[in-house]
């Protein structure tokens, strides 16, 4: 055995390719790529010698395909954007939502969302619709917001005719059977229960702050169906609403990944001259109200000590959201407000961080990093065709609510102060990056095309938006923030509110120079 090992060793050490000794990591061939354990002399900001310079893609937002818009004889707009790939996203967007329910039972849009893609004149059941889409690898979805209802399908582009025909049938010819309405009633009830039980209060707080900001008008109306209205919904109520708001002049058929001429042909075939299930006739009860910002406070006292969904206990928190009126997405100040919102940023105290998480935004640097007891501080910007709302959501222990409110009001006041050039450029870069990254997804492009054409009858291209973002100056941020601070605040509060300051004190803090709440003197603590 020893002789065999010795012979093999001699063979490997002999001549030929097998006998060549391999270079070791200590050899000069490797040593020139290594620092040898010492700190490298080349800084990370300098390119490595001998390495070719990489060519990066430019962030100009230029798209290879043009957004085309055609208006049919009945007023319906057809918008398309071609895109590489064999799949497409097609849908119908409608100027319909909770803001238009002033003359109707609140919650109709919420019910229609649950009834979407149910049985129609051509399809006997939801299963038949799904089987039809399955033949083209398709999926469907319906979403409602305060001002828009969207029916969408993603499928193989070869099935475009089938998809548009299906969408037209779903939107204009739903059966709305008693059984389907009862199923939708159960789904709405479950969603309302879930909304009140979930540990994350953000959807509920958003609902409350809109109610406070726009008292009983337009976008301040309930987005979710109130519990007392769930049992009142029937086919007649739904048809009365559909007759006035599901009209061609309030619709856009949008498609991404399709040829425009083919989409227009399908629209003429299925959406021109058709009689909807609720009959024809002029829309007479259409709400064209303009949003009236009122400001105010909405409070909901609730025991938040046991909201954990599992065995791990969740800390008892009080949540507040303070908002001020900003501007509509049609105004020139919309872009500065978007940059301001990105500059504020924020998040939760347990965020893992990482690239793009906004760890250098103001709400992280000034709030979460300095106050360990703050569980959340996040900025949100809601914008509509006639108004907007910039909010900060914060969460903390109920005993520190007053201090938390003062920290938030101070951050609002600081918005109108000095804006550092570095933080502004970082916010602009992050906003541009987020915009371009989101627009890589076909469904997002579809929604962008549809919403813009629905609101403005045209589409502002990404490179135009990038140019507007780059043009934002520190004085623009200071100007829009100063204008915003002159308005009344909208306040939403949820949880143990025993330490919540009075609304007048919050308003006084936002009107002060330093954002501090008025001092409260108590004889007994």
From Swiss-Prot:
The keyword Ribosomal protein does not apply. Substrate recognition and binding subunit of the essential mitochondrial processing protease (MPP), which cleaves the mitochondrial sequence off newly imported precursors proteins. It is found in: Mitochondrion matrix; Mitochondrion inner membrane. GO terms for biological process: protein processing involved in protein targeting to mitochondrion. The lineage of its organism: Eukaryota, Metazoa, Chordata, Craniata, Vertebrata. The modification N6-acetyllysine is found at residue 299. GO terms for cellular component: mitochondrial inner membrane; mitochondrial matrix; mitochondrion. Its main location: mitochondrion. Heterodimer of PMPCA (alpha) and PMPCB (beta) subunits, forming the mitochondrial processing protease (MPP) in which PMPCA is involved in substrate recognition and binding and PMPCB is the catalytic subunit. Belongs to the peptidase M16 family. It comes from the Eukaryota. The modification N6-succinyllysine is found at residue 64. This is Mitochondrial-processing peptidase subunit alpha.
